[in-house]
Design a protein with these regions (language model features):
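Positively charged n-region of N-terminal signal peptides that target proteins for export
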Residues: 1-4
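Bacterial N-terminal signal peptides
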Residues: 7-16
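Sec/Tat signal peptide C-region and signal peptidase I cleavage site
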Residues: 18-22
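Intrinsic-disorder/low-complexity accessory segments
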Residues: 23-168, 209, 215-216, 221-223, ...
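Acidic, glycine-rich active-site loops and adjacent beta-strand->loop/helix elements
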Residues: 135-137, 173-179, 219, 248
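Divalent-metal coordination cores built from histidine and acidic residues
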Residues: 160, 168-215
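Short, solvent-exposed turn/loop segments enriched in Gly/Ser/Thr/Pro and often Arg
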Residues: 172-176, 187, 243-251, 794
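N-terminal Rossmann-like NAD(P) cofactor-binding module of classical short-chain dehydrogenase/reductase
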Residues: 242-243, 728
Length: 953
């Protein structure tokens, strides 16, 4: 029986929902189950064969009917509308009490019991283990191995399997159904099996974001991320989760933990130790079964720093997250001869010989890995369950008392204090050298007083909680922020009345997030800045790149105003049971009057887009003004109150939780408002899909911007002004020179196929933006009145069109400029603070400073003639230490470098966004820079900046 999943809201409902499972045990346990070969016509792992998602679902339904060990549930829909399924596999006896097992794990995970009861629940309990596959769809092993694993767990009756089924509840989930369907169909479409390939798929293998689907798990923009997180952090609470990936390091078969440093300082040490233990179980079982070629730690670049992957988010929820990266493809692959992988060492204990590696062998390796995890989860289920409780208890205790998180900046502060003491002692005649004081070899350690005065400085203690005031200008975005926390299982409260904490009064409706909760690590990681260590292998060496970004706390990047509270506090707070919408407030406009929406509010653009679509008038104020006792900044939106506009305004305000004021007269004076008009937007993309373009596509859809995707062939054909008013080029679209290739291919990687090798429907998307052919057409477009918005590397267009700018990140060597070497400058994926000229219409609604995301991004210096040509800086780095979260080696080189440039070109406008203002659709705090740019060129009369001083020239 195939059952639609129903979320259990209480134990009684859970038991009622589980009642059909008891009936299911009456099914025949000795009946033969359909094998993959009987279902599909081949064994899983056969050369040149892949199962697609439609076939997978049919097979799961059949096994669900045949087996008393498995129940299939739907956990939600994908972005393309497919059902996402989880197979719950355990013994028939456990199926009878599934609700009780689930409830016991919930109580342990949330530390809702005392230690004695927790130990009893752990002794009597069952480990819940999540195993997934297929997240990155061109990594086809992950999805296919899941089919084989499900079949074996339902059919094998050896003692180990029976013990595993008795001690564990296994959640097998295919986490990118849309991608599996696309890639498998693409591979199998080729009639000549020897020509089959997973390369060259025509679009992203997740509808919007391709490979970045594994970077979305704290933000949860995509439905697949929401589905998985709900299961793991709000419903089932697995003790271990296992995320299958490809491909293994060259010269090896697979990577499995332990991971390399650094690990994130927010999560419990039991996480790191648990990862190492489970990873060691994988390596040990592989070696025992004669499966060589597994590496660990420095054998690959993976770490546990970044929160946003499906397995890394688990660390901040007290779950042991395991990643493997394994080679294997239905088209046989070859293990290359890599000399460094042949000498055994701690991180490469069991080298493998080079040679052909079959897909079936990769399946067997994957099943071994699964069994290694399930075996240790079974044998040590009491430890895993109690440790899950213990980590939750530790988190609650840490949030309930003074606590200090030690990170590199605190160590550096202590080091400076010790060196200062040592220098003072040396001047006084005491024989205390700096090396001894710092704990060097032969020394007696550092002065203990420094531990208390610096590492435990009372001013530097962790917050007991955070308050997000409801009177901040963009409260709807603040509400989106707390909703991401709620969707990740974090407890959030809302004030039912005004209250005072630490002498400051907060209005009703403010959000409160206390640190004393089981998922405290996630709370701290989302609010507090990351402090990544200087990962430099030797003095003077180049920094070792992180696996992903280093600074990402969304309280900063979303532009949230919040307060850190260092002491315990309470107030008139109610716990929010689920995601919320901010309270809307619409003040009626008098007859002949107008509505005003604050320019700070991102969701104002939803209202603007709906109104313009309905052919209603919208304008923007060009100077600050006051209505009903409330101050509004320049750029605020003015909407004449009509029978047509009023219901649109009221509806969008209710949906988004916006405040809308009614007023009698539209402000004019010396700065009359400018009228907006609907614009025709073209968003660049190319064959295979661009992840930055996909993210932007999703963002435009959420804020209801009308747009068309435009491909290089259309751009090269010219006559662009007849089709578009605004063109948007994301990172990776416009090269600096024609030898440079943009992104493309499956998931946003790789090259493009020959036209005659792909279906005709995809051929119009082939091609690249080129300096020689495309840029001249873009020049015509902007000179004839169009607006071009460029992001990241696509700001190269500024150089192509001759703007008076130069690269800020260069040095002069032997009389010639060259990019700063990595030994001197390296800023990988961090949050920096930038100054903003918010008198410029491009920055309407922004504060005078902003947190911006920066990932080795372009930065500019303006030439002396820039001002005369109307080229203006909109954002720049004002100082030698702009880093606010992450890692910035050599950040002093950014001092006064310009991040955002606005320039007139002919009758049109060109905007250079050096930093990625919509990176992975996380930095809500800079979205409006992009949105303002879309309407900037169409405003009539054209708005202009009102401030001309205090900006870099």
């Amino acid at each position: 029986m195939f059952k639609k999943y129903v979320a259990f809201v209480a134990l009684l409902l859970a038991m009622a929902a589980a009642a059909p499972q008891a009936q299911k045990t009456a099914a025949t346990t000795t009946a033969k189950l359909t094998s993959p070969k009987e279902q599909f016509g081949w064994d899983i792992g056969a050369d040149y064969r892949l199962v697609n998602y439609t076939q997978y679902v049919e097979y799961l339904k059949k096994l669900d009917q045949q087996s008393d060990r498995m129940t299939v549930i739907e956990i939600g829909k994908t972005e393309e509308g497919r059902p996402e399924l989880t197979a719950i596999i355990t013994s028939p006896e456990n199926h009878k009490k599934l609700a009780q097992i689930k409830e016991a794990n919930r109580r342990l995970a949330l530390a809702e019991v005392g230690e004695e009861q927790a130990r009893q629940l752990a002794r009597d309990g069952k480990s819940i283990v999540w195993i997934d596959g297929g997240l990155h769809a061109t990594e086809v092993l992950g999805a296919q191995q899941l089919i084989e694993t499900i079949y074996r767990l339902n059919t094998k009756s050896d003692p180990e399997t029976m013990r595993i089924l008795n001690d564990n509840v296994i959640l097998c989930t295919l986490v990118n159904p849309d991608g599996m369907e696309l890639v498998s169909n693409w591979y199998m479409r080729e009639p000549d099996e020897k020509k089959r390939s997973t390369n060259g798929i025509p679009r992203l293998y997740q509808k919007y974001i391709g490979h970045d689907d594994n970077r979305d798990f704290y933000m949860m923009n995509m439905s697949e991320s929401v589905n998985a997180n709900r299961v793991m952090y709000r419903e089932w609470y697995p003790a271990i989760m296992y995320n299958h990936h490809q491909t293994g390091p060259a010269g090896a078969v697979l990577f499995a933990p332990p991971f390399r440093d650094p690990f994130n300082y927010n999560f419990d040490p039991l996480i790191v130790l648990g990862i190492d233990m489970v990873g060691s179980a994988i390596h040990t079982r592989l070696a025992a079964e004669g499966k060589p070629g597994a590496v660990m730690r420095t054998g690959a670049p993976y770490s546990t720093w970044f929160n946003g992957g499906i397995r890394t988010t688990s660390y901040f929820h007290n779950q042991i997250g395991i990643l493997t990266e394994t080679i294997g493809n239905p088209t046989p692959v070859e293990i290359p001869f890599v000399l460094d992988m042949q000498l055994p060492r701690a991180d490469v204990p069991n080298p493998i010989a080079p040679g052909i590696f079959k897909f079936r062998t990769a399946i067997e390796y994957s099943v071994t890995n699964n069994y290694a995890i399930l075996d240790i989860a079974s044998k040590r289920h009491e430890d895993f369950l109690f440790n899950m409780y213990k980590m939750a208890r530790n988190a609650i205790d840490a949030g309930s008392a003074d606590h200090w998180t030690i990170h590199p900046k605190r160590i550096e502060a202590a080091r400076e204090a010790i060196e200062a003491q040592a220098a003072g002692a040396s001047r006084g005649g005491d024989n205390i050298g700096p090396r001894a004081a710092l704990g060097g070899r032969g020394g007696g350690g550092a002065p203990v007083a420094v531990y208390a005065s610096v590492l435990h400085d009372p001013k530097m203690r962790d917050p007991r909680g955070f308050i997000v005031p409801s009177d901040q200008p963009d409260f709807p975005t603040a509400t989106k922020f707390v909703n991401t926390l709620i969707k990740a299982g974090v407890v959030v409260h809302r004030a039912t009345a005004a209250f005072t904490v630490a002498g400051k009064q907060y209005p009703a409706g403010s959000y409160v997030v206390k640190a004393a909760q089981p998922f405290r690590a996630h709370v701290m990681d989302m609010f507090e800045p990351q402090d990544h260590p200087d990962d430099i292998p030797y003095p003077g060496g180049a920094p070792r790149p992180p696996y992903d970004v280093t600074g990402y706390n969304i309280a900063y990047s979303m532009g949230i105003r919040f307060d850190r509270v260092l002491d315990g506090f309470d107030g008139p707070f109610e716990k929010l049971p689920d995601v919320v919408t901010a309270a809307a407030k619409v003040t009626a406009a008098p007859r002949g009057g107008a509505y005003v929406i604050d320019a700070h509010v991102n969701d104002a653009f939803v209202a603007v887009n709906r109104l313009l679509k309905a052919k209603q008038a919208v304008s923007r104020a060009t100077a600050p003004f006051t209505v009903n006792g409330r101050s509004y900044p320049a750029g605020s939106f003015l909407i004449p109150a009509t029978a047509e506009s009023t219901p649109i305004v009221e509806k969008v305000a209710a949906e988004k939780g916006m405040t809308v004021d009614g007023m009698q007269n539209v402000p004019t004076g010396d700065h009359p408002p400018v009228a907006l008009k609907a614009v025709r937007i073209g968003l660049w993309d190319q064959y295979g899909g661009s992840m930055p373009s996909g993210w932007t596509r999703w963002l435009f859809e959420q804020f209801e911007f009308p747009f068309d995707v435009v491909y290089p062939q259309t751009l090269d054909a010219g006559n662009l002004n007849a089709k578009f008013d605004v063109l948007v080029f994301v990172d990776g679209a416009i090269p600096m020179r024609d030898s440079q290739q943009g992104q493309g291919g499956g998931g946003g990687f790789g090259g493009q196929p020959a036209a005659d090798t792909i279906p005709a429907e995809f051929r119009p998307t082939l091609g690249r933006v080129t300096v020689g052919k495309t840029v001249p057409e873009l020049k015509k477009f902007v000179e004839n009145g169009g607006t071009i918005l460029t992001i990241g590397s696509s700001t190269a267009l500024g150089y192509h069109l001759g703007l008076p700018i130069r690269n800020a990140l260069v040095e002069v060597a032997n009389g010639a400029e060259r990019p700063l070497p990595r030994e001197k400058y390296f800023v990988p994926g961090s949050i920096l603070e930038a100054r903003i000229d918010n008198s410029n219409p491009l920055a309407y609604g922004m504060d005078s400073t902003a947190m911006v995301f920066y990932d080795e991004s372009p930065a500019f210096r303006l030439q002396p003639e820039a001002a005369l040509k109307g080229v203006r800086p909109v954002a720049w780095y004002d100082g030698t230490s702009p880093l606010r979260s992450g890692w910035a080696w050599g950040q002093q080189y950014l001092d006064q470098a310009v991040s955002i440039v606005e320039a007139p070109v002919g009758k049109g406008h060109l905007v250079l966004f050096g930093n990625e203002v919509n990176w992975r659709d996380q930095p809500h705090g800079t979205f409006k820079l992009l949105f303002n740019g879309i309407y900037y060129g169409s405003a009539s009369p054209a708005p202009a900046a009102t401030r001309t001083t205090d900006r870099p020239q």
